[in-house]
Amino acid sequence: MKGERLLSLKERSKEVYWKRRIFICRTFDIPVYFIFFQYALRFLLSEKEDVPPHKPKLIVGGERRGTSSFFKRKKQRSVLGKEKNYLPDIDIQEHLLIIFSVRSSLPSLREGRRSSPQTETNFMEKQTFIATCLFGLEKLVGEELDALGCTRLGTIDGRVRFEAPASEIPWLNINLRYAERLLIEVGRCPAPDFDTLFEGVRSMPWEDYIGRNDQFPVKGHSIKSRLVSLPDCQRIIKKAAAKRLGGAYGLEYLPETGVKYQIEFFIFKDEASLMIDTSGTPLHKRGYRPVSTEAPLRETLAAAMAKIARPRENVLFRDPMCGSGTIAIEAAMIMTNTAPGINRGFAAEEFPWLDGKLWDDARDRALDAIAETEFEAYASDISPEAVKIAAENVRRAGMAKHIKVFAEDALKIKTEGRRGTIVCNPPYGERLSTVKEAEQLYRAMGRHFATLDSWQIYVLTSDDYFERLYGRRADAVRRLYNGMIRCNYYQFFKNRH
């Protein structure tokens, strides 16, 4: 049988693998080249009855664009119909390279994933994800996921679990404004001890995501659990995943030279969640802030502060202690409906089972969604250096039309006869200045901001005695975290005593 003959070629080949529906065979054996090429031609001429039964391999979202840069391609029509083939120049220096396009794959020869998520209908329709976030932002993240059409499954501190199609990975990464990372949940298992953890991790379908040559480093956290040693947890999880992948691909050694899949674990109350990171760089890194002032505010937290303050077109938005300008920029991005991740890259762009066209389409949709608005914001700071940095960040974010940046003492601002909202992040005394200086500033803020009749004031600080120092009780207080610093977000809706 020709199919059996082709299977025997695998043993004589030095390397056989799939790359985006392109079959590549490298070999030093000249006779193998002619035998294999003969089979290839017959296969392209529709002699498919000799092919062993198999399921067609699909790419999530369609065929991915582009191929590796190590060979050149020539496009021409296939003798089988309208499908395009890519027949590159053959370079015979150290080895022979034979490439031909096929309509369906031979799973026993596929070097990548023996069993891929794209072969399962439910992978396209439903995948479980985890959106991580700063403590206190879970509600905003959940509401955002609802608006993006996802199905929430549950929430714990700093994590929102939900379902969505795998094809939505690009759209979610580009649009999530308050989340820190988007993780694929591979599985969950009990973890009262290392043996149970090992067996649980080994039972998970890692080969559905990770190829035989791919990298899979491990990191994570353990909270309120008996397994407290993170290095030991990493070692056990790595070993279990390697055991599963080695068995799936028939390998004793995994080279880990390919695409990087960052495995993350979260063990909470002796239950482990195993995930793969699709974001790479945390989502709070939008790409518009290459340089920042000392103790910068994380972009996701700044966006949450702006959202809670409800920016409006007819109300002046002011940050009189702007630092890097992050709060004003995030407010303008909300008002213009600018996707926060539109100008950055993501780890999942390298995943071969996720169609590259999905990323292009998601970015095109995000660009089309940007809205015109009359929103206006002032970002000012007493430091000329901070003003310079903020102005550059505003320019890089594309928000110069909506944000005016200038130097000014926060204790000298005036209403100018306009309605307004102040949102600020004054020094805490923990990261900037001293506690005594911060307390003096809070007292001065209370005296001066009281003169801004009818303006709404929003202040983020870690000082639990802020209201006493400010001289007024807040109308609402919300617990938020700036990194690992526990803060309170004080909200004064009617600025009158």
State the predicted function of each range:
Residues 1-5, 11-16, 20-21, 46-49, ...:
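Intrinsically disordered, glycine-rich low-complexity segments
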Residues 223-226, 282, 427-431:
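A short, flexible beta-alpha/helix-coil linker loop
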Residues 410-412, 416-497:
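C-terminal catalytic and target-recognition region of SAM-dependent MTase-like enzymes
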Residues 9, 18, 34-38, 44, ...:
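Short hydrophobic targeting helices and cationic amphipathic motifs
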